[in-house]
Amino acid sequence: MQAKYSFPEKNAFRAREALDTDFDIDVHDPKLYINLDDIRILSEETDYKDSLYFMLNIDPDTQNLDTTAQDYSKILFLGHRGCGKTTEIRRIHQYLNNPNRYFAILIETEKELEVSKMQAEDFFITMVIKIIRQLKNAGLSGATDSFDDLLKEWLNDTEVQKEITNTAGVEGNASVKADTDGNILMKALSIFKFEAEIKGTLARESKTTTTIRSKIKSNLLDFITKFNNALAEVKEICASNNKGRDLLFIIDGTEKSTFEFYEEVFQKNGHILRSLNVNLVTTLRLDAFYKLEGKPNLDFYESVFVPMITVNDSNKDVLAQIVTKRIDANSFFEPEALAYLVEMSGGSIRQLLRLANQTLLFSRGKKVGLKHATNTVKKEGEKLYHALSPDQKELLKNKKWVDNWSHPDASMMLYAMALLKYNGNAKINPLIQSYF
C-alpha cells in the first residue's frame, strides 16, 4: 500500500522518504515540481528547450509542428545524473504530445526494462510494443495492425507461441482476440501486442527473448523495412484522426546501462537509428557521450544539454524550495543549515536531496543546525574523494580534464559527479573542493 504524504511533510520518517533521490514527485504530487528554467537558462544559447523544439521543427511563433521538413531528427538529451532530466523530459513530452505537434511516445526504460541487463535489440523491441499500446490507449487499436507483419516474423516459431500463450494463461483470458479460431500464432500475437509484461519478457533469457533478439540482429534490413512501413501507415492514421502531425519517440532512463550497451546502440548500430523514419529524442549518459564523441555514426545526432545550475545569492531561495516543498523546513532545518546545503549542492538537485536526506538521518529527525549540515557535507565529501583513483585525483589537482573529456578518467568523473559541468564550463564538486 502506497504511503500517504502530507506536503510539506512534518513526520520525520516520511520526510526522509520524500527527500530520497528516487522519490517520484509525479507519482506522489506533481505540485512538488519546481520550474528551474529561469535560473538554469541564462541566455538564448543555453535555452535547451527552445533548441530542442526547433530541432523538432516546432515553429517558434505558432508553437505548431511545421511538416515541410523531410528529414527525421535524432537528438541526444544530455546532462548530469540528478540535474532534472527525467522531470523535464516528462514535461517536454506533455507539451509535444499534442494534435498540432506530435503523437509522442514516452519510454521510461527503468520502468519498462531491467536496465542493467538491457541489450541493444531490447531498445527496438520496446519501441514497437510501446507505440502499439499507446495507439490502443488513444483509441486507435486498428492502427496497431500495421505492425502485424513485423510481429509475425518475430513470433513465427511454435515454441515461442506456446511460451507466450502459456505464460499468459490464454485459455481463460477473454481479452485475447475472439477470432483466432485456434490459431496459436494469432493468439500469441494479440498477447504480445497488448498484454505481455515487457520487463518480465525481456528480463528472462526465455525462448521468446532470445529468438526475437536473434531475428533482429541477423536481419536488420528486414526489421528496418517492416518497422518503417508500419510507421508510415501509423503516421497517416494519427494525422487523419487529429492525434498528431508526426510521430516522436522520447526515451529516458538508460543511465544504469553499461557503456557497452551505449556503444552497441548508438555507435555500432547507429545506422539503424539513422535508418528509422521517425523522430527520436533519447537520454544518454554524459560520460558515454564523451567517450563515443567523434566515432563513426555519432556525427548525425544533434545534442541538447540540460545545464547545471550555478548557485548564487539570487537563486538560493529557489533551489531551497526543492526541499521545502517536500518537507516542513521549520520543523527540520535551521535557515543557515539549509542555505549551506544548497550552496554545497553545486546546483545538483540529486546532491541537494541526498545532503538533506543524510543530514536528517544524522540528526535523528531533530531540527538540523549548521553543525549537522557541516558534518554531513564532510562525510559525503570524504566518500566521493576516496572513491577516486590516484590518476583521477591527479587530473583534478592539475586541472588536466579541461578539453579532454574523452579521457576515461575525465568522463567517468562527470558520471560520478566529481566534476560538474555548467554551460560549457566544468568545476570540481564543492563537496571535494577543499582537497584540491
Task: Indicate where each model-derived feature is located.
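Surface-exposed polar/charged interaction patches
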Residues: I25, L42-Y48, M55-L65, P99, ...
